[in-house]
Amino acid sequence: KNKEELQEMINQDKWDDIYKKYPVADGNFVYLPAGCLHAMGKGNVVYEIQQSTDVTYRFYDYHRKDKDGNERELHLKQAIDCLSFDKDIDKNDVHPVVKVHENVKETIFISNDSFTVSQLLVIGKCQYKCDNYQLATVVKGSGKVDEYDVKVGDNFLIPTNTSIELDGQMMIMMTTK
């Protein structure tokens, strides 16, 4: 679709014609490049890597109303101007690279000039060396990072050229530049 077709469908409230639904299962990784209109469905957890910004543009808000009965403000022009219409997200162009270390499986989902996203599946005690800084989020299970207890939802930073001890049964999402 192009900007004009999108704007016309929005004007006609034809949201089902605008988006595509993709089935996902636990553990799937779906890469959506910047500029892709997206939303998540019920039960999904999103690990979104983005540049720091204080702006969010709202395309649609389910016609929800505030306490005064008014629909919340939408930012259609600004949002449409930020979209890339040349992206083919049907391909989900991800080619994971898997590395197995002692008691940890590392899956590198995507690595480009802007960022790298990987996943660690920890199944016991192991040493993990980081060449670059890492932003880490525990997404399943629990365990220890060095002497610190961690669980689902916990985040931590790993400095450049640091070795850490991981122990437990957990899945950790990692991001670096």
Predicted regions and their residues:
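Short, well-ordered beta-strand micro-motif
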Residues: 119-121, 157, 174
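N-terminal non-catalytic cap/leader segment that marks the start of a structured domain
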Residues: 1, 12, 173-177
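Active-site lining segments that contact anionic ligands and/or coordinate catalytic metals
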Residues: 104-105, 114-117, 132-133, 140, ...
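Loop-centered beta-sheet repeat module
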Residues: 9-57
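Ligand-binding loop in jelly-roll beta-barrel domains
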Residues: 35-56, 149-151, 160-177
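C-terminal amphipathic alpha-helical segment
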Residues: 57-125, 130
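Short acidic-glycine-tyrosine-enriched beta hairpin
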Residues: 18-31, 45, 144-163
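Glycine- and acidic-residue-biased ligand/ion/polar-headgroup-sensing regions
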Residues: 1-11, 43, 119-148
